[in-house]
A protein has these predicted regions:
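Active-site glycine-rich loops that stabilize anionic/oxyanionic intermediates
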Residues: 53, 60-65, 276
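Short glycine-enriched nucleophile-adjacent loop
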Residues: 146-158, 164-167
């Protein structure tokens, strides 16, 4: 495990925490549940937040902390601007030496078990505390956090309305340390049905299923861009729609593919960030569509993934 954890510090790298005024308003929440995964919960609740607002869960990658990712990716400022509750799970070194979420361990990815259950308990606590809307709960994350996002959407599809995976891998790709490296690069090529069966087998849920937005850099050598396509195949199969885009356009000049149902509702989408390596797309600034703070694996590519995710979710 130590070998994997040390390697993961590079392979599923994290954002360096940077203190800001917004991050200082984050607070740790204890006693949110039985916490079988022994995670820490941090939360940002805007002052005067009315009841009935959404909840977003944002998950970091290896070696980073909740505040660093929440601030760097832009989620803290968006929570304030759009008025939603932000939940930031944080891994502990006792679980993983480099604080990677254990997205490749069966005991931490099965419904009702380990880290996945801890995150689900955080959601329920946040909903109860703020009077949030249980129909508008979303999950997102970078790299290892993106892989854990796939876990949460698959294991708790009744909890999450949608998700955003940045530089992640499909659910069920790995069940061991060795598998984890293969999943990241070069990735695993399975049929859409095989990928879909992994999700359908993760719970007794029969639908509706969470929507999914997948962001990935085209020159990512840490988590192969092929994983973006495999995620599309997995979730279009789950939704019962073809893995062929119904429309294509661009977002901030980057290729954007939409996979919609017969009514035109977007169920799966991808954004391929041309020329970007491994990291979270951000666009620092004060403009309406801008957010984030540049740093390690927080890449200023003139588009903020967090803002576009929040817009697609109607936050």
């Amino acid at each position: 495990m130590r070998l994997f954890s040390l390697a993961a510090a590079v392979l599923l790298a994290a954002v360096v925490s940077a203190p800001t005024a917004s991050a200082a308003e984050l607070r740790e929440v204890t006693g949110f549940g039985s916490n079988p995964g022994a995670l820490r919960m941090f939360e940002y609740v805007p002052d005067g937040l009315p009841e009935g607002r959404p909840v977003v869960v944002a998950m970091h990658g290896c070696t980073q902390d909740a505040a660093g990712y929440g601030t760097g990716a832009g989620w803290v400022e968006l929570a304030e601007r759009a008025q939603f509750t932000l939940v930031l799970p944080q891994q502990e070194q006792l679980n993983n030496a480099n604080r990677c979420f254990n997205w490749f361990q069966a005991g931490d990815t099965a419904r009702g078990s380990g880290e996945a259950e801890s995150i689900a308990q955080m959601v329920q606590h946040a909903l109860g505390e703020t009077g949030g809307d249980p129909a508008r709960v979303y999950a997102t994350g970078l790299s290892a956090g993106g892989a854990m996002t796939a876990v949460m959407l698959a294991a708790y599809p009744d909890v999450f309305a949608g998700g955003g995976i940045v530089a992640g891998v499909p659910f069920g790709c790995a069940t061991s340390v060795v598998d984890a490296f293969t999943c990241m690069n070069p990735g695993k090529d399975r049929t859409p049905e095989q990928w879909g069966e992994a999700v359908r087998g993760a719970s007794s849920h029969q639908g509706p299923w969470p929507t999914l937005s997948v962001w990935h850099g085209t020159t990512d050598s840490t988590v192969a861009p092929a994983n973006q396509r495999e995620l599309v195949e997995q979730w279009t199969d789950v939704h019962g729609i073809p893995a062929t885009p119904t429309s294509t356009d661009t977002i901030a000049g980057y290729p954007h593919e939409v996979y919609a149902d017969s009514s035109g509702r977007t169920l799966v989408e991808t954004v391929a960030i041309t020329g970007m390596g491994h990291g979270q797309p951000i666009d620092p600034g004060s403009g309406e569509e801008q957010c984030g703070q540049a740093g390690a694996y927080l890449l200023d590519v003139d588009v903020c993934a967090a803002w576009h995710l929040s817009e697609s979710w109607g936050l």
